Amino acid sequence: PVSWYVATTGNDGNSGTLDSPLKSISKALLRVNPGDTIFLREGAYHEFVTPTRSGEKGKLITLKSYPGETAKIDGTGMTIKGWFSALVQLKSVQYMTFENLHICNATNSDVNTDPEGVYINGVSRDITFRNCKVYNIKSTCLAGHNNGDWRSAHAFLVIGDDNGTPIRNLTIEKCEIYDMHTGTSETLTIAGNVDGFTIQDCEVHDVENIGIIVAGGDNLNAGGNISVNYARNGVVRRNKVYRCSHQVSKDFWEGVYNNPAAYGAIGIYVCGGASTIIEQNIVWECDRAIGLVSESNVLATKDCIVRNNFVYNNYRTGIYLGDYIGYTVGGTSGCYVVNNTLYHNNLVGGALNGSNNSENINDEKDSEGEIRLAENCTNNTIMNNLIYAVTDRDIFVRKYTRSGSKNKIGYNLYYSPTSANHKWFWDGVEYTNFSSWQKASGDENSLYNVDPKLVSLDIFA
């Protein structure tokens, strides 16, 4: 293996050694072979990083900052046009690792332009981003949704767009992603034919919409074969996800997008994806915390596990299952919500005012519930969760309609020091009596009004 060196003071005619570094990352990428490492010296590199060579199994190509220094792949002054012109573009690249880099400053205000930090597609596999920071990736477009061209950007955009071979073995770990204006898009997107991924030990925060999404049937890969056009077999683990909220750019959401409620962003979201484990995450101050929801009329969100997460101080619901009411019919099926702690969510009322949905539901005066089941929830299990309601408007569990079937609920602990929110909804009917709730929902072996004796509430202040 060979070590290559790049420095902002280098020369592309140099040999690429430590004493004679190259100037551009692109030149180093043309020389690199499987097993080689490219070290970037301190400084900002204003270029698109587009590898054309791949590593091999056991012989990764690595691009990283020189030890003790910070290299930035920096879009300042660069032209960002259209979609998929990311600062780092991995098109069918394999066996490559990026470490200790900053990927930053890709912005544009034009319509139909999607600034991106990292774009991965094709038959890419065994790609790792480790200890990287991705920030200031922004669309400042002021076109609203009704104009047809609207605000969009991504920190990571991963699209499995090959119908035959999925993207495999993608890892994003120990990265920090923040300061994003993504409009109606998401911060970290895994979509299309992706089979096997891990997002772990990251921080995603201070972004104006969804934090992490695992998606299927998405318009980003509109031509995909529906049998494989969904991300699956992934793990989202030990991440800290916070302030993923329309409140980050309230002027856009309330003014341009005309959404006066402005509380629609989900921290961690599976939307038409499948077989994904969401575990040991901490999610706070998002509009909604964790969603197993489908915006698809074809693909359900299915066979996912949400376990051992800590969800608190979110504006609306803590954990959300089902469709958007009156909007889609894909639903949520075969999912498990177990061993989670939910505390003090629903700081504001719900989004439904009685006239903006086909079921004439109104939840804006109370709330969506710590756990929310909207439409078309089938064969899901909700067990062994600690549900601690605090605000006067809060609700332990809210199932909105009679749609769906065979959902199992039990072995939960429900507690609130405020008697006003000792309530549940099942099939749209409100219950304030625990026995009546159990009879209606089939809830078995849960505990009610037993103080869980949390060690400290200081974290919630």
Model-predicted regions and their roles:
Residues 45-51, 75-86, 107-116, 138-154, ...:
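Short glycine/acidic-rich loop motifs that flank beta-strands on beta-rich extracellular proteins
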Residues 60, 66-69, 94-105, 125-140, ...:
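Right-handed parallel beta-helix
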Residues 13, 36, 148, 345, ...:
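Acidic, glycine- and Ser/Thr-rich low-complexity intrinsically disordered tracts
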Residues 26, 30-37, 46-62, 72-99, ...:
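Extracellular beta-strand-rich solenoid/capping regions of secreted or surface-exposed proteins
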Residues 1-7:
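Boundary/junction segments of secreted and surface-exposed precursor proteins
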Residues 8-46, 437:
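Acidic Gly/Asp/Thr-rich repetitive segments characteristic of extracellular carbohydrate-active
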